[in-house]
């Protein structure tokens, strides 16, 4: 995956999420990163990392799921690029904006979110714990009305 594609997708994603209303510094940072990665070329504009999927999911109304995956991707990308002095300030501005808008300005929520992405799925202890918690996760995903029906049918 090309970093140029990532930055362009980020720019479009942020514009879509924020309804094209961003602080001037965020837009300036996005433009600066766009220039740094030369992400406005035809080879970049022809392809989409997220936007085609984004459009399809908007129809279904399950945007929060897709947003969380996209945000996770960008936060990991920022982690890789944070040591690049030429763009570190711009990345910091955009990361702060994402934390403010997606995580309700909670660093604790962001850290918890990122810790999930770092779990090693090949680790047997992680696997055991994950399967131990799976039933609770599945129950929380069920609509509340179907939970009530199940409780009544058991009586």
From Swiss-Prot:
Q: In which tissues is it expressed?
A: Released primarily from activated T lymphocytes.
What GO biological process terms are annotated to this protein in UniProt? Answer: adaptive immune response; antigen processing and presentation; apoptotic process; astrocyte activation; CD8-positive, alpha-beta T cell differentiation involved in immune response; cell surface receptor signaling pathway via JAK-STAT; cellular response to interleukin-18; cellular response to lipopolysaccharide
Give the matching SUPFAM superfamilies.
4-helical cytokines
Pfam families named in the record: IFN-gamma
Where in or outside the cell? Secreted
Superkingdom of this protein's organism: Eukaryota
Please give one Gene Ontology molecular function term for this protein. type II interferon receptor binding
The record's listing under Gene3D superfamilies reads: 1.20.1250.10
State what the entry records as the consequence of deleting this gene. Answer: Deletion mutant mice show no special developmental defects, and their immune system appear to develop normally. However, they show susceptibility to bacterial or viral infections such as vaccinia virus or Theiler's murine encephalomyelitis virus, despite normal cytotoxic and T-helper cell responses.
Give the glycosylated residues: 38, 90
Listed GO CC annotations: external side of plasma membrane; extracellular space
- Supply the alphabetized keyword list: Antiviral defense, Cytokine, Glycoprotein, Growth regulation, Secreted, Signal
Q: Give the signal sequence positions.
A: 1-22
Summary of the function given for this chain in its UniProt record:
Type II interferon produced by immune cells such as T-cells and NK cells that plays crucial roles in antimicrobial, antiviral, and antitumor responses by activating effector immune cells and enhancing antigen presentation. Primarily signals through the JAK-STAT pathway after interaction with its receptor IFNGR1 to affect gene regulation. Upon IFNG binding, IFNGR1 intracellular domain opens out to allow association of downstream signaling components JAK2, JAK1 and STAT1, leading to STAT1 activation, nuclear translocation and transcription of IFNG-regulated genes.
Family membership, please give it: Belongs to the type II (or gamma) interferon family.
Q: Which PANTHER family match?
A: INTERFERON GAMMA
The record describes its quaternary structure and partners as: Homodimer. Interacts with IFNGR1 (via extracellular domain); this interaction promotes IFNGR1 dimerization.
The name this protein carries in UniProt is: Interferon gamma
């Amino acid at each position: 995956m090309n970093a140029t594609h990532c930055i362009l997708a980020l720019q479009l994603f942020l514009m879509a999420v924020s309804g094209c209303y961003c602080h001037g510094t965020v837009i300036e940072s996005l433009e600066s990163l766009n220039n740094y990665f030369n992400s406005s070329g035809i080879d970049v504009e022809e392809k989409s990392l997220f936007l085609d999927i984004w459009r399809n999911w908007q129809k279904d109304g399950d945007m929060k799921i897709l947003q969380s995956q996209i945000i996770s991707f960008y936060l990991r990308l920022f982690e890789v690029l944070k040591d690049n002095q030429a763009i570190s300030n711009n990345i910091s501005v955009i990361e702060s904006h994402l934390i403010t808008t997606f995580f309700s300005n909670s660093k604790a929520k962001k850290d918890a979110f990122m810790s999930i992405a770092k779990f090693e799925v090949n680790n047997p202890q992680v696997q055991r714990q994950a399967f131990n918690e799976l039933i609770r996760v599945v129950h929380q995903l069920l609509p509340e009305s179907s939970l009530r029906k199940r409780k009544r049918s058991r009586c």
